[in-house]
């Protein structure tokens, strides 16, 4: 699990497929959200990768026109290149690394039921297209195209890191990550993310369960406790309410942190460097800094 939090910044999500073999070399084709290249490699380099196509996390190294691939991690059991290609097309520019972390999490899920749930969510085009392109709010935080997935990714990564820091077992860390990633997914149905008259205004947490109804139904049948724990992450958090599941507590804390960091950064975005306090244009609150 720590590996997903420690990927090199240059590592990216790739689809790799062998094109041809000549003498002692293999030609492999790699596509990502930003690259489309073919590289000649020694057979040993890709010996653990399915030649017919496989999802990878790796570093593509270009030096003086010579291509190489390093630190290859195989994402198991993903064989549909079309799904990955669509995600590459949908993810907003500059947010490509989010896909690396989101898909890479599949390698670290200890429960087959949770893995099946997560794969089903990622493969659902009707869900993932708006999720990758929506805003997280109208005029509050992360209120721009791609803001929802950016905020959700922040919550997921921070929740997983805190869970590891506090010594939670792998299953709880996994629930914290997935719960953090999906805690706001109901926002894809809110008025500021839906064109025309079909958008709604209401508690987005209640829409989480509508958006994920198909996947959650299967999870409830196969792993009731996991369903309960994940549902706690997706539910409305009332003031002074204590969550029975610690991953839920962590997710709600990280949600607030992501919002506050976004508004803190905006408060100081357009003021001189020597200002030590400023009012956020979004929430009208006063923020301070030490340097």
Report residues per predicted region.
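Hydrophobic alpha-helical segments at protein termini of multi-pass membrane proteins
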Residues: 1-2, 56, 140
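Structural detector for short beta-strands of small beta-barrel domains
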Residues: 3-23
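OB-fold (S1/OB) nucleic-acid-binding surfaces
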Residues: 19-41
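Short nucleic-acid-contacting surface segments enriched for D/E, G, S/T with interspersed K/R
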Residues: 42-59
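OB-fold/S1-family single-stranded nucleic acid-binding modules
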Residues: 61-92
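Acidic/His-rich, divalent-metal-binding segments that scaffold phosphate/diphosphate chemistry
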Residues: 80-198
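Divalent metal-dependent catalytic cores for phosphoryl transfer on phosphate-bearing substrates
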Residues: 144, 162-273
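C-terminal membrane module of polytopic membrane proteins
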Residues: 258, 273-287
């Amino acid at each position: 699990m720590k590996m997903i939090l420690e990927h090199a910044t240059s590592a990216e999500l790739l689809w790799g497929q062998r094109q041809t073999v000549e003498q002692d070399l293999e030609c492999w084709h790699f596509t990502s959200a930003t690259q489309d290249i073919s590289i000649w490699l020694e057979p040993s380099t890709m010996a653990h990768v399915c030649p017919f196509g496989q999802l990878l996390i790796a570093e593509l190294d270009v030096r003086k026109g010579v291509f190489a691939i390093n630190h290859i991690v195989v994402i198991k059991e993903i064989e549909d290149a079309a799904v990955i290609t669509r995600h590459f097309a949908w993810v907003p520019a500059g947010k490509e690394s989010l896909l690396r972390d989101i898909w890479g999490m599949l390698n670290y899920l200890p429960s087959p039921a949770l893995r099946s749930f997560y794969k089903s969510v990622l493969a659902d085009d009707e869900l993932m297209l708006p999720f990758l392109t929506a805003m997280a709010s109208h005029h509050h935080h992360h209120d721009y195209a791609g803001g929802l997935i950016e905020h959700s990714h922040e919550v997921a990564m921070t929740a997983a890191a805190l869970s590891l820091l506090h010594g939670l077992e792998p299953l709880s860390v996994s629930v914290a990550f997935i719960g953090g990633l999906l805690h706001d997914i109901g926002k894809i149905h809110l008025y500021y993310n839906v064109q025309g008259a079909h958008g709604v205004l209401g508690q987005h947490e209640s829409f989480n369960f509508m958006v994920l109804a198909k996947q959650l139904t299967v999870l409830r049948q196969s792993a009731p406790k996991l369903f309960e724990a994940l549902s706690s992450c997706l539910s409305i958090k009332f003031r002074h309410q204590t969550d029975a599941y610690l991953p839920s507590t962590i997710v709600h804390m990280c949600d607030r942190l992501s919002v506050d960091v976004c508004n803190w950064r905006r408060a100081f975005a357009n003021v001189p460097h020597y200002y030590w306090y400023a009012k956020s244009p979004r929430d009208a609150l006063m923020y301070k800094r030490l340097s």
